[in-house]
Amino acid sequence: MKTIRKKLAVAALAGTALLSASAHAFFGNDDDTLKLGYLVKQPEEPWFQTEWNFAEKAGKEYGFEVIKMAVPDGEKTLNAIDTLAASGAKGFVICTPDPKLGPAIMAKAKSYDLKVITVDDQFLNAKGKPMTNVPLVMMAASQIGQRQGQELYKEMQKRGWNPANSAVMAITADELDTARRRVDGSIAALKEAGFPANQIYRVPTKTNDIPGALDAANSLLVQYPNVKHWLVVGMNDNTVLGGIRATEGQGFDAQNVIGIGINGVDAVNELAKSKPTGFYGSLLPSPDVHGFKSIESLYKWVKDGVEPKKFVEVTDVVLITRENYKAELKKKGL
């Protein structure tokens, strides 16, 4: 039932966004207001709703109209570009449902002379390589990873752990560039802080979700029965949560495990539990910055001919824990 409700919510949001855009296309406005699109793959997610909200704030500040559209798949993405062109839009920001759609999206946009900026996910070309010629606003993977490692070490010191009987469980997905850079950044920060390099153990996950990370973590834990304290590193909240679930299954108390995720939104239920778990906190990125900065750059490109940087890394993150998560999420409209 929960799954059905979520699907209905997605359909409703997608339908509303498309109807709104279609109305612009067929009826237009009475004025000559500049129109720019903002296309997202998962409109039901708080992250993208916040991006939309802050894109609209930029629109109010600079005097342009934001046409919000849901693009959950390739067909809807290409249709949305047709609709934007018909509405008179001059360009769009997009978080694509599939990075491999990059060449098709750019070909369609070029046919209408629309400018494009990508946000959150980078386009890939036919060979699977990043399309670095398309402007991108994205979370800074290596720096976020470094912050994860720094915060883990800081909390470990606060708890007075002995490094001699402590270890790092680094759940990896090295085939994904962002995941690899986050985990590598975290490990580098831990080593720099003084954590013993030979007690950092990498284990690959087959899937980037809780069950996949749980399986990976279990396979690692049984190899090191003498470790008393675990630091858990992963590319996002769910991989870290999988590691936490594994330590619980192996009998570790919450005070002997520290996991810090990345994303924040997926960590809320864990942080809201009545009793603390090994999941200490999460690094909450800035969808507000992504939404405002990406469409602001597009506006200046269209209006003033100021070509945007090809790659803007956003480093703004805040560590949310059981103590502050409600206040920090509220600040970002999540």
PLM-predicted stretches and their roles:
Residues 32, 170-173, 178, 283-334:
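Hinge/cleft segment of the Venus flytrap/periplasmic-binding protein
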Residues 105-143, 265-277, 320-321:
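Flexible loop/hinge segments that line or gate small-molecule binding clefts
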Residues 47-62, 144-151, 177-197, 212, ...:
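Short, solvent-exposed amphipathic alpha-helices that sit
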Residues 37-38, 89-97, 115-119, 169-170, ...:
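Periplasmic-binding protein-like
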Residues 117-127, 233-280:
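Venus flytrap/periplasmic-binding-protein-like
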Residues 30, 77, 135-165, 213-214, ...:
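Hydrophobic alpha-helical segments within soluble ligand-binding/sensing domains
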Residues 66-90, 203-224, 240-243, 267-268:
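Structural motif
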Residues 33-54, 58, 62, 67-79, ...:
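Extracytoplasmic "Venus flytrap"
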